[in-house]
Regions:
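Accessory alpha/beta interaction modules
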Residues: 1-166
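Short, Φ-rich (hydrophobic/aromatic) sequence segments
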Residues: 29, 176-179
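Solvent-exposed, non-transmembrane segments of extracytoplasmic/periplasmic domains
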Residues: 172-173
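Short, charged alpha-helical interaction segments and adjacent helix-coil junctions
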Residues: 2-3, 63-76, 102, 156, ...
Length: 279
């Protein structure tokens, strides 16, 4: 089985950049599950990638010792549809793991046990631990014992001060929590770019993710400043739709996203359109 490695050709997030490395990933998993896998543990990274748009489809997935396949998603907004998303992800991961020849053979094959984890650090209220079930999404709810298909996702709140035992077991996770917390605090009194820059500098001076931020500081800054997600797109689209009632702008916004436009770039784009139309 191949060694863990990060494919830097594909767009990622600060979270996946930090925890995509084998040692950091094992530290994170050990912190969450209170296990003690060492650096000699056999890890195979199975994160899904979109070759067309050169970006990752899911955040992190990996196989431990050939026994467990773990999928970890990091989110800043709650998504009740995660069980279905995880189902689609795990099906593709199993396709990577299992040979098609074996799949149609007469001998039973074995597959790693799946585990599904979401780490949440958004601003909405969220309990320390929450369980999401695929069966809760069925149009006709059934008793748990009658569900023919089930998938369970465990959501952990990793905001500063929540699930603190995780941070005590992982310096990297503790540092990540502090870093994000500082950005949230600084952005209250300054623009986002300045807040990110200040948080990076303060963390380096205070020995919080020091080596990581010294090596990847500019990359982290750019990721956080221009890192778009679907929630950002939806917020901008809703704002534009309220202003002029033309929901067809959604497609234009999504096209601009694919070209790497930031939220500020897109808002400026539409302002210029409005000014041109009024001349």
């Amino acid at each position: 089985m191949e060694e863990a490695k990060t494919n830097r050709k594909y767009k990622s997030s600060v979270f996946t950049l930090l925890f995509g490395e084998k040692d950091n990933l094992l530290e994170l998993y050990n912190a969450i599950e209170n296990t003690n896998y060492g650096s000699d543990t056999d890890i195979w990274i199975t994160t899904l990638e979109d070759a067309l748009f050169m970006e990752q489809i899911n955040d992190i997935s990996f196989v431990i010792e050939g026994k467990f396949v773990v999928m970890i998603e990091h989110q800043s907004s709650m998504n009740p549809n995660m069980p279905l998303r995880m189902l689609l992800y795990i099906a593709r991961v199993y396709e990577k793991i299992v040979s098609e020849d074996n799949l149609y053979g007469s001998k039973k094959i074995t597959i790693p046990n799946p585990e599904f984890i979401v780490l949440y650090n958004g601003d909405d209220e969220c309990p320390d631990k929450q369980v999401l079930r695929l069966s809760d999404m069925f149009s006709e709810p059934l008793p748990e014992s009658l569900a023919k298909l089930e998938l369970v996702v465990t959501v952990y709140n990793i905001n500063k001060g929540r699930n603190e035992e995780f941070a005590t077991r992982s310096e990297k996770l503790k540092g990540y929590e502090i870093f994000i917390y500082l950005i949230k605090e600084y952005v209250k009194s300054m623009d986002r770019g300045s807040a990110i820059k200040r948080a990076i500098g303060d963390c380096i001076r205070q020995d919080v993710l020091r080596d990581f931020l010294k090596e990847h500081g500019s990359e982290v800054h750019n990721m956080l400043l221009s890192g778009w997600n679907w929630d950002d797109a939806k917020r901008v689209w809703q704002k534009e739709a309220r202003e002029d009632g033309r929901e067809e702008r959604l497609n234009e916004i999504l096209d601009l996203m694919k070209k790497g436009y930031t939220s500020a770039d897109i808002e400026n784009h539409f302002r210029k359109q409005t000014r041109s139309a009024s001349v």
